[in-house]
């Protein structure tokens, strides 16, 4: 039998690469770029109403920008150097920080306690949870008018109560620290319930198994609160602190409405409760109309808010300790 030694295996024909169809290319393009198109409107709106005003305000702060004048000469950093040497500006900074500390610390502590109370098995829980939000949806002007009457010097209810315990009447608008306390009380009344609902929403996400295990081990409610609830609420507490910092350092309506009269924007005759935003309004608009100087105040306020918020976050992380998995 003859054997063919030079036989070779059959060669397969070369595989022809086919171009993806038009539909496949469109599908790949959609999967790759459509998420960016979906979020593009947000960044567009943020750029128009967020980034552009911020940049434009900085540009204006470099000019002697009189709102009633036609020319706006470039002055560089003169507005900032003048502002840093302005005693009225630093007076308003101290007022802002004082009101912020007096209002924010009790506010967040009360909100945390209130949220823990609302997280229990109460009758008509939905009604109570809705009720704590009523002060926040009330008109700020109406709240300010009511509190201005409560803290009135001659016929206010607070002085009437103080008189019954042997304390002489306090002029809440003429005394600097007293004005801080009055305005802080107004701010706390409006925003404690709002922060309580934020904490409550975070508490609802904590697994109930942790509390049941702690109860089996003999931990009481107080121990469960400090050992389970507070550590797991750390990201939410940081969020609430940042939001409260932004709002507290931009305080305007409450002190403005509390100090009604001819010196309202000045926070009283001796600027007892004038905040940075009120001082910015006084310079940028009536009576000075110096928009460049007011823009410089706005930028320094922005820097102050960023600094205080960063310090708050660092302190909370340092006091609470860094746990694995915490957002940074």
Where are these regions (language model features)?
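Acidic/proline-rich low-complexity IDRs
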Residues: 4-7, 11, 25, 166, ...
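Short, charged N-terminal extramembrane segments
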Residues: 18-21, 278
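Cytosolic juxtamembrane amphipathic/interface segments immediately preceding
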Residues: 22-27, 31
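Short, intrinsically disordered terminal tails adjacent to the first/last structured region
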Residues: 1-19, 328
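A structural signal for multi-pass alpha-helical bundles of membrane permease subunits
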Residues: 31-328
């Amino acid at each position: 039998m003859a054997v063919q030694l030079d036989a070779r295996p059959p060669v397969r024909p070369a595989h022809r690469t086919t171009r993806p169809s038009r539909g496949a290319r469109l599908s790949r393009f959609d999967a790759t770029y459509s998420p960016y198109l979906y979020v593009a409107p947000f960044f567009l709106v943020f750029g128009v109403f967020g980034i552009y005003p911020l940049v434009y305000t900085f540009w204006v702060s470099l000019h002697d920008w009189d709102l009633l004048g036609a020319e706006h000469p470039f002055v560089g950093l003169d507005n900032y150097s003048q502002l840093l040497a302005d005693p009225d500006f630093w007076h308003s900074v101290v007022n802002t920080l004082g009101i912020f500390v007096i209002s924010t610390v009790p506010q967040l502590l009360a909100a945390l306690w209130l949220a823990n109370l609302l997280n229990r098995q109460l009758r008509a829980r939905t009604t109570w949870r809705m009720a704590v939000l009523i002060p926040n949806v009330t008109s700020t002007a109406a709240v300010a008018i009511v509190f201005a009457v409560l803290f009135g010097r001659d016929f206010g209810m607070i002085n009437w109560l103080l008189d019954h315990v042997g304390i002489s009447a306090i002029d809440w608008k003429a005394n600097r620290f007293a004005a801080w306390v009055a305005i802080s009380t107004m701010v706390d009344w409006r925003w404690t319930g709002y922060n309580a609902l934020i904490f409550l929403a975070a508490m609802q996400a904590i697994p109930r198994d942790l509390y049941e295990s702690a109860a089996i081990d003999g931990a009481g409610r107080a121990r469960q609160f400090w050992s389970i609830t507070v550590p797991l609420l750390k990201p939410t507490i940081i969020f609430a602190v940042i939001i409260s910092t932004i709002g507290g350092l931009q305080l305007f309506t409450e002190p403005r409405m509390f100090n009604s009269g001819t010196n309202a924007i000045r926070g009283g005759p001796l600027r007892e409760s004038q905040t940075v935003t009120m001082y910015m309004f006084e310079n940028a608009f009536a009576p000075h109309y110096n928009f460049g100087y007011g823009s410089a105040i706005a930028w320094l306020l922005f820097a102050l808010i960023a600094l205080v918020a960063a310090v708050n976050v660092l302190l909370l992380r340092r006091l609470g300790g860094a746990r694995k998995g915490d957002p940074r």
